[in-house]
């Protein structure tokens, strides 16, 4: 059984809007020239990657549920951003370790989602 919380249509729309804003923020911060984007010190570049994709995946799961197209799309987004960074030449470099951090954030969100669903089902 797949966990999907019972949300009102309005709550789903807000979740979808938050997902879209997070997606746009990730695209901007990932593809803008390196000197044009702020980089808060959260413990390193890989932590920022994992955190960004954790939040994006969590919002996507909230708004749309655990659909394969959502999870596959986020995976492709992470890979596509790294490829684009390697090709753009704007002071950014594509990095396989960044992709692993992106996927780690996505996997952590999915695991937490499943654990939450099991906990809710046990109640």
Tell me what each language-model feature is.
Residues 13-14, 65-71, 95-96:
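Membrane-helix interface segments
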Residues 1, 118-123:
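Short, charged juxtamembrane terminal tails flanking transmembrane helices
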Residues 32-33, 65, 89, 117:
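Short helix-capping/hinge motifs at transmembrane helix termini and TM-loop junctions
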Residues 61-64, 68-85:
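Membrane-embedded catalytic cores of phosphoryl/pyrophosphoryl-handling enzymes
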Residues 1-58, 74:
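"…centered on the first transmembrane helix and the immediately adjacent amphipathic helix/loop
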Residues 36-45, 81-104:
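Interfacial helix-loop-helix junctions of multi-pass membrane proteins
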Residues 51-68, 104-116:
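Membrane-interfacial alpha-helical segments at the cytosolic side of multi-pass membrane proteins
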Residues 56, 73-80, 100, 104-108:
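Hydrophobic faces of alpha-helical transmembrane segments in multi-pass integral membrane proteins
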């Amino acid at each position: 059984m797949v966990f999907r919380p019972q949300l009102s249509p309005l709550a789903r729309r807000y979740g979808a809007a938050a997902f879209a804003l997070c997606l746009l923020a990730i695209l901007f911060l990932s593809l803008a020239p390196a000197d044009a984007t702020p980089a808060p010190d959260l413990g390193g570049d890989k932590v920022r990657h994992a955190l960004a994709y954790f939040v994006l995946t969590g919002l996507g799961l909230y708004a749309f549920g655990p659909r394969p197209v959502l999870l596959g799309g986020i995976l492709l987004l992470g890979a596509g951003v790294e490829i684009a960074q390697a090709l753009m030449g704007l002071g950014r470099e594509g990095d396989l370790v960044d992709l692993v951090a992106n996927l780690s954030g996505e996997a952590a969100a999915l695991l937490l989602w499943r654990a939450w669903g099991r906990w809710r089902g046990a109640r």
